[in-house]
UniProtKB/Swiss-Prot annotation:
Keywords: Virulence. SUPFAM superfamilies: DNA damage-inducible protein DinI. This is Virulence protein MsgA. Belongs to the DinI family. InterPro entries: DinI-like_sf (IPR036687), DNA_damage-inducible_DinI-like (IPR010391). Pfam families: DinI. The gene is msgA.
C-alpha cells in the first residue's frame, strides 16, 4: 500500500523543514494503522490524500489525517 499526502506548501511557508516534519509525523501515524505502507508527502498548491487502499482503509486514513492536523500545534513547529 502507498499513502501520499499532497499539501498546500503556502500553509507552511516560513517553517524550515516543514516537509520533513510532516513526513515524519504522517509516517508515524500511518504505520500505526498500516505498518507496511509506503508514505510520501508532496508540497504543491492543493490538498489531497492519494492511496491504493480500499474504501474502508481510506476512511481510516482520512480520520487519522484529520486528527493529525487538529493536533498540528503540538508537532508542526520549528525545533
Amino acid at each position: 500500500m502507498f499513502v501520499e499526502l499532497v499539501y498546500d506548501k503556502r500553509n507552511v511557508e516560513g517553517l524550515p523543514g516543514a516537509r520533513e516534519i510532516i513526513l515524519n509525523e504522517l509516517t508515524k501515524r500511518v504505520h500505526q494503522l498500516f505498518p507496511d505502507a509506503q508514505v510520501k508527502v508532496k508540497p504543491m498548491q492543493a490538498n489531497a490524500l492519494n492511496s491504493d487502499c480500499t474504501k474502508t482503509e481510506k476512511e481510516r486514513l482520512h480520520r487519522m489525517l484529520e486528527e493529525m492536523f487538529e493536533e498540528a500545534d503540538m508537532w508542526l513547529v520549528a525545533e
